[in-house]
Amino acid sequence: MELLKGNAVNLNDTAYYNNRELSWLAFNERVLQEAQDANNPLLERLKFISIFSSNLDEFFMVRVAGLKDQVSAGFNQPENKAGLTPKKQLNKIAIKAHALMTVQYDTFKNYVLPALELEGIERLTFNDLTKEQREFIEEYFDEQIFPVLTPVAIDAYRPFPMLLNKSLNLATLLYDEKQAEEENRTKLGIVQVPSLLERFIILPSEGQKHKFILLEDVISSFTHKLFTGYTVSSVTRFRITRNADLTIHEEGARDLLKVIEKELKKRKWGAAVRLEVGKEHIDERVLALLYEVLEVKDEDVYIMDGPLDLTCLFSLYKKLAPLYEHLVYPALIPQPPQDLGDEEDVFEKAIEHDILLHHPFESFQPVVDFVRDAADDPNVLAIKQTLYRVSGDSPIIQALKIAAEKGKQVTVLVELKARFDEENNVHWAKELEQAGCHVIYGVSHLKTHSKITLVVRRKNGKIERFVHLGTGNYNDATAKLYTDFGYITSRKDFGVDATNFFNYLSGYTTKPHFHHLSVAPFDIREQFMDLIDEEIRYHRQYGNGYIIAKMNSLTDKPLIKKMYEASQAGVKVELIVRGTCCLRPGIPNVSENIRVVSVVGRYLEHSRIYYFHHNGEEKIYLSSADLMTRNMEKRVEISFPILDIEMKARIKAILQLILADNVKTREQNKDGDYYYVINGSTEEIDSQVKLFKMAYQNTDAE
């Protein structure tokens, strides 16, 4: 009878869903909690403040900008989950974002800065400087800063300039006593703080102390040198965040590379979506003018009590970390993979058995070696790879270029539409083409987000295929910071699937046949819907239905509704969702059998793992895809099964360890709010630290 009652519930009820944007802000709040956590090393807390700022910048440039575009276009339809119109979403975002930024500045000013001072790291303002320090700073300004600055006067002939996205600016009110008429005596000048100059200027100080002054403090103090003949009456600091969402019209685009290069130039000058103003020295006349010229409303304006643009704290972290090792995380070195010895040949090992890699606990080097060794191997005929985000000096790109120069058939899909990596990827696409690689840009109207490499080798007259599949990017830099899985196999069916997949990307093929791969936008959603339905059937028959799903974000309504159906049927569902989660757990007759946790800690949880008990058969899939509508419909994604029994047991044990985390885990309640998990055991379990310890133990055991 309970099930009938559950089925009578309307699963479209907006009370059962979290709004996507507000859920994302709740995730960024968890990032901010890491800055507030006194158990974290002090400089790491500084870095989390910077990450929070960087995340929020992108959120305004893309998500808030998109909602503002909808409002401007007169679109007022409520979104399909929580039922909020674009206008309501913007109102709620403004309230939450103002509150979070206030907490951020309070954390920085009243907790982190005083703690840094106790360590001998101190921010000084111009008024705090000694005579010797003032002389040093004036000379530094004259020689290093002044030649780079461009003072811009605002008058009838020189209108308010178009200021760069995310640039820090000084609005200077000037007084001209020589003017006869009072109304002509006040002038306005704008000075952009150059982003290429060092933001933190280290001052001469005694002993081991590190005292610094901010670049904008120095420029503000010497503004009179830029506007000679005028009296400086005020200097107001402000920063603009602009709409940076690219509009790419792929229909009829003969050269996508050129279209994207053209659009990238516009990104710097989009409409203002946020105005940040420094509270100290604020001039109300300047503020009124900024409102007018930028066309912003009260909810778009953030008056902050401290330095603007705290993303800059990352550069301070990098400057101080080598000098204050006790204030950063202890070094943890990725270990040789469990399935691959230190010096073993990755291809020969893959012929023996499948290889599972768990980064950053296990080294990313075998993935680099996989491509590099293929480039050097005279028996290798072809290398095919998808690239979404790569590092600035990528060893994988270098290996692909070498392979092409050696005459191998090298095909690289470079995703030009990877947000905020477009410029980088345009650069790599050109370099790869010049080296002789066959570069493709993917499928029209879809982002290729899948992570796959195929190596084709002819040995002793036989063709062999080796495949690497991953949950994360081919990026050796982020592989040290993101948790991800990689999988290397020589199984014939996987090789055939990889060949068919690349032919689909490069040719006019419709959906190919796959033995093991599921590919979005074709069938990943359908596959997971079927798997959940099977779990419901098994639960009704045997009472042992159990699903674990780990991902970055969960927003897809059909899949959320299917999970609600599983909960109503009694299936136990445990979700590890780091970021946005539109599903609400613990609602009677809807989701009381669902638990949602989020782990935010030292490493960014990035792996996508989907586990189905399947009456003891235990099906496990790894994927490049989160359970988001965009991943199901607008991206080329791959989901693949783990077939090896030992590997499945290992992945399940990792999932259970993450679910047992009682240090970095927050749990979502039925109202959509997150709380730290109450530690019910005597042992503190930080899953990320524990996984590193296990990797070290495996190395020692060998």
From Swiss-Prot:
An intermediate of this reaction is the autophosphorylated ppk in which a phosphate is covalently linked to a histidine residue through a N-P bond. The keyword Nucleus does not apply. Catalyzes the reversible transfer of the terminal phosphate of ATP to form a long-chain polyphosphate (polyP). HAMAP family: Polyphosphate_kinase. One of its GO terms (cellular component) is polyphosphate kinase complex. Its cofactor is Mg(2+). InterPro entries: PP_kinase (IPR003414), PP_kinase_C_1 (IPR041108), PP_kinase_middle (IPR024953), PP_kinase_middle_dom_sf (IPR036830), PPK_C_dom2 (IPR025200), PPK_N_dom (IPR025198), PPK_N_dom_sf (IPR036832). Mg(2+) binds at R389, R419. Pfam families: PP_kinase (PF02503), PP_kinase_C (PF13090), PP_kinase_C_1 (PF17941), PP_kinase_N (PF13089). One of its GO terms (biological process) is polyphosphate biosynthetic process. This is Polyphosphate kinase. Keywords: ATP-binding, Kinase, Magnesium, Metal-binding, Nucleotide-binding, Phosphoprotein, Transferase. The lineage of its organism: Bacteria, Bacillati, Bacillota, Bacilli, Bacillales. GO terms for molecular function: ATP binding; metal ion binding; polyphosphate kinase activity.
